UniProtKB/Swiss-Prot annotation:
UniProt xrefs under Gene3D superfamilies: 3.20.170.30, RNA 2'-phosphotransferase, Tpt1/KptA family, N-terminal domain
Gene: kptA
Enzyme Commission identifier(s): 2.7.1.-
UniProt protein name: Probable RNA 2'-phosphotransferase
SUPFAM superfamilies per record: ADP-ribosylation
Disulfide bonds: none
DNA damage in keyword set: no
Keywords from the named record: NAD, Transferase
GO molecular function: NAD+ poly-ADP-ribosyltransferase activity; tRNA 2'-phosphotransferase activity
Organismal lineage: Bacteria, Bacillati, Actinomycetota, Actinomycetes, Kitasatosporales
Keyword Transferase: yes
Length: 189
């Protein structure tokens, strides 16, 4: 599978497993899962056919591990394999992730033009359900670079956790929080 096709299928999956499942007639369960066969049929009906082999390649090759496939599932009316996006949903789903103790520091990639709002309001999920935090500066830099020249913010996750804030970690290692109040951002200057 060539790189262009891989990216195209990955973007299609993100759009329909995170943001707009209804556009192709999918109904995600409460935890964001849908039967693989249902997804493949819906995509084909809406003019974007791809094979199970292509789907498996995208799931395995995605450097950000955006998707999870569970094989042989027999839960919630799904019999067979099911798939979901690991995080980043704008549709209502409960990823059913247990609370987790974060490392002392986590990182958030952003850009300068939103720093005034961040200093005042902290980090908010915006259209998503959670604020996404990276376990290392390198990942946060790549995230911030998608919107321009990146700035990396350090989050005092240990202090946040001790203050009662709940963290969860998705299947691909992205840390999730409901919000990050400004007092837990370690800002210079």
């Amino acid at each position: 599978m060539d790189e262009r096709r891989t990216v195209k299928v990955s973007k299609y999956l993100s759009k329909h497993l995170r943001h707009q499942p209804e556009r192709i007639g999918l109904t995600l369960d409460e935890n964001g899962w849908v039967a693989v066969e249902e997804l493949l049929r819906a995509a084909a009906r809406h003019g974007f056919a791809f094979s199970r082999a292509e789907l498996d390649h995208v799931v395995a090759a995605n450097d950000k591990r955006r998707f999870t496939v569970e094989n042989g599932c027999a839960a919630d009316g799904v019999h067979g394999d099911r798939i979901r996006a690991n995080q980043g949903h704008t549709v209502a789903v409960d990823l059913d992730l247990p609370p987790a103790e974060p490392p002392a520091h986590l990182y958030h990639g952003t850009v300068a033009r939103v720093m005034d709002a961040i200093r005042t309001e902290g980090l908010r999920p915006m259209a998503r359900h959670h604020v996404h935090l990276s376990p290392d500066r390198e990942t946060a830099t790549r995230v911030g670079a998608r919107r321009g020249r990146p700035l990396v913010l350090t989050v005092d996750a240990g202090a946040m956790h001790r203050a009662g804030h709940v963290f969860r970690v998705s299947a691909n290692g992205v840390w999730l929080a409901d919000a990050v109040p400004p007092r837990f951002l370690l800002l210079r200057g």
